[in-house]
Amino acid sequence: MNIKATINLTDTMLNKSIIDANKSVCELAKEFSFDYSEHEAGDKNAVSCRYPDGNIAKVTFYKAKTRGDKRISITKLKHYAQAGDVVTLKQSKEAIEILIND
């Protein structure tokens, strides 16, 4: 089954690189052995990902060190997206495909 997560980007998400993990992100994280409900603050899991142009990056599912908020980090995102865009993370074998406004 192909799991997808969608994120509606805001200025804060892009400029501070802090993205809250919504319900769809939490479901996708489980497919990569990271269940937010079973992890403690500071825990993280990095997964290889790919942009449509073939560029390799990294998606990190993590719980913030201080309060344990559920978060996700996507490297190189500023180069591909801007505030108002919708980012789709799509499960693809052992990696994640990153799609912008798809």
Stretch-by-stretch model annotation:
Residues M1-D102:
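Acidic, low-complexity intrinsically disordered regions
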